[in-house]
Amino acid sequence: MNQEEIKKILPHRDNMLLVEEAESVDENTAKGRYTIKGDEFFLQGHFPGNPVVPGVILCEMMGQASCCLLADKVKNCTPYFTKMNNVKFRNPVKPGDTLESVCTDRKSV
C-alpha cells in the first residue's frame, strides 16, 4: 500500500507519518518502509555534521508499520501501538538509508 492508503489506517500526518509504503507478506506479517531523506525534523541537531536517526524515531517507524499489519484484523478503529520488547539498535540509520520494518503478530488480536 502507498502512503495515501496508509493515511486511511494511521492518524499520523505531515512529518510524523513515518511509513512511506507497506505490504502484507501473509496474514501475520507485514513490511513497512521509509527512506531517510536527510531533511527530517528529527535529524536537526542529532548530530550536527553526522546525522543519525534517534532510536525513539526508529521505534515509532516500527510501531506505525505494525499498525498497518493490524488494519485488516481490526476494522473501524484506530490502531495504537503499545509495547516493544527487547529492542536493539545494531547500526546507525543515516540519510539515504531505507528502513524496512518486518512486523509479525505473535498474539491473536
Predicted regions mapped to residue ranges:
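Short Pro/Gly-enriched beta-strand edge/turn motifs at strand-loop
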Residues: 1-6, 97-101
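An N-terminal domain-start capping segment
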Residues: 7-14
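Terminal leader/tail segments of proteins
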Residues: 13, 21-23, 35-37, 84, ...
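Catalytic strand-loop segment that frames the active site of acyl-thioester-processing enzymes
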Residues: 14-53
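Active-site helix/loop of acyl-thioester processing domains in fatty-acid/polyketide metabolism
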Residues: 22, 53-76
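Hydrophobic beta-strand-centered segment that forms part of the acyl-chain substrate-binding groove
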Residues: 65-105
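Conserved small/polar residues in nucleotide/adenosyl-binding loops
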Residues: 107-109
